[in-house]
UniProtKB/Swiss-Prot annotation:
GO terms for biological process: translation. One of its GO terms (cellular component) is cytosolic small ribosomal subunit. InterPro entries: Ribosomal_uS2, Ribosomal_uS2_bac/mit/plastid, Ribosomal_uS2_CS, Ribosomal_uS2_flav_dom_sf. This is Small ribosomal subunit protein uS2. The keyword Plastid does not apply. It comes from the Bacteria. It comes from Caulobacter vibrioides (strain NA1000 / CB15N) (Caulobacter crescentus).
Length: 268
C-alpha cells in the first residue's frame, strides 16, 4: 500500500471548501479563508491540501510504530463515518458523547470498561438465575456504557494521536489531549479555533461527503502505516538472521564428515 492520495477535485466535489456564514467566523481562521460568496466564507483549499498531507504522514507514522489512533466525532453527521472508519483500520473511536476525563482520568474510565465487560459476560450467559427486571436493568446499563465506551473498550491506554471532527463540539477532548501532550489532527471549519491543534486541516466539518472523505483518508493512512510496520518488522528480522547463516555454515562444515564417520568407527 501507499499513503492515500487525494486531489483538489475530490475536496471540491465533497464541498470541503464551504465554510460557515461570514458572521459566524472565528477571526483566527482568517489566514485559511480564500474569500466569501453569498455571505459564506470559502476555505483556501490550496492550504488545506499540504496540511492534510502532513497530517496523513503523521498518522501513518504513528500506526507504523504500533501506536493507537483515536477518532473523535460525536455530532450526528460525524457519528457513523467516524465509527466505520475506525473499525475498518482496527482503531478506536468516540462517536456518541465524550465523557469528561476519558483521557485525563483513564484509570476511572478503565473501571467503567471493566464493568461493561462484566455486563457483557453476564448477558452473554443469558443472565441465569436473574429476574426479567434485573436483566432489563443490566441491559440498559450495558447499552449506556456501550454508547460511550464501546469504541475505546479495547484501547488499553491513552491514544498516541487523536483525529477530531468539529473542534468546537469536542473542545473538552482536545483540552484533555493537550494536557497529556497527545498530538491532535483536526478538521477546522471557519468558526473553529486553530490554537492548540497540532495538525490543522482547514475544511468543512458538516457536509456528509466531506466528513466521509476525511475519515476514509485517515483510515487509509492508518492501514498503510500498519502494513509498513509489519513489513519493517519482517525486514529487520531477516537482516538480523541472514548474517548468521553463512557463519554457522562455515563452522559446521568441517564437523559434518566427523559426525558421519562416527557411526562407521563404532560399527567397526
Amino acid at each position: 500500500m501507499a499513503l492515500p492520495e487525494f486531489s483538489m477535485r475530490q475536496l471540491l466535489e465533497a464541498g470541503a471548501h464551504f465554510g460557515h456564514q461570514t458572521h459566524r467566523w472565528n477571526p483566527k481562521m482568517d489566514r485559511y479563508i480564500f474569500g466569501s460568496r453569498s455571505n459564506i466564507h470559502i476555505i483556501d483549499l490550496s492550504q488545506s491540501i499540504p496540511l492534510l498531507h502532513q497530517a496523513l504522514v503523521k498518522v501513518r507514522e504513528v500506526a507504523a510504530a504500533g501506536g493507537r489512533v483515536l477518532f473523535v466525532g460525536t455530532k450526528r453527521q460525524a457519528s457513523d463515518p467516524v465509527a466505520t472508519a475506525a473499525k475498518r483500520c482496527a482503531q478506536y473511536y468516540v462517536n456518541h458523547r465524550w465523557l469528561g476525563g476519558t483521557l485525563t482520568n483513564w484509570r476511572t474510565v478503565s473501571g467503567s470498561i471493566a464493568r461493561l465487560r462484566e455486563l457483557e459476560g453476564v448477558l452473554a450467559g443469558e443472565g441465569q438465575g436473574r429476574s426479567k427486571k434485573e436483566l432489563l436493568q443490566l441491559t440498559r446499563e450495558r447499552d449506556k456504557l456501550e454508547l460511550s465506551l464501546g469504541g475505546i473498550k479495547d484501547m488499553g491506554g491513552i491514544p498516541d494521536i487523536m483525529f477530531v471532527i468539529d473542534t468546537n463540539k469536542e473542545a473538552i477532548a482536545i483540552l484533555e489531549a493537550r494536557k497529556l501532550n497527545i498530538p491532535v489532527v483536526a478538521i477546522l471549519d471557519t468558526n473553529c479555533d486553530p490554537d492548540g491543534i497540532t495538525y490543522p486541516i482547514p475544511g468543512n466539518d458538516d457536509a456528509a461527503r466531506a466528513l466521509q472523505l476525511y475519515c476514509d483518508l485517515i483510515a487509509d493512512a492508518v492501514l498503510d502505516g500498519l502494513a509498513a510496520g509489519q513489513a519493517a518488522a519482517g525486514v529487520d528480522l531477516g537482516a538480523s538472521v541472514a548474517p548468521v547463516e553463512p557463519a554457522l555454515a562455515r563452522e559446521l562444515a568441517p564437523e559434518a564428515p566427523a559426525a558421519e564417520a562416527a557411526p562407521e568407527s563404532a560399527e567397526g
